[in-house]
């Protein structure tokens, strides 16, 4: 489940959520095949956490008990009229390899994370991700299941995937995404 809002935004009572199918997610170990259907795509980073407990209607104060790892995901989105398409028809959000999931990091003790995408860098405060608030809000509408991936926001780091190049991203010095674009 992906929340379509920038970092630091508070979850709303009617969230803009994108549900992604398992077949749309590829791992950092597989190459990224850019679809032929559109001329331009953008590769945008977002933090994500892995749910490891079953839950419904989770209060904010208990939400941290439901996730045990963090990573970066990369959304590969078509660009239409100069803007990435973050939601809408499944043709834009649910095609094969629409999401590249990075390697999981189980150390959740850091308060600040450094994110890099190629030469771009930024530091994010864990509190700005609003993970607990997002899980609490989503659990009112959806059951949280073991293995679910929740992305609370997107980051202002993006690049254009170019065929026959590599895209790398790291989280606090750990290389979590290193993929070949085909």
Predicted feature residues:
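Catalytic-core "active-site belt" of small-molecule-metabolizing enzymes
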Residues: 1-143, 157-182
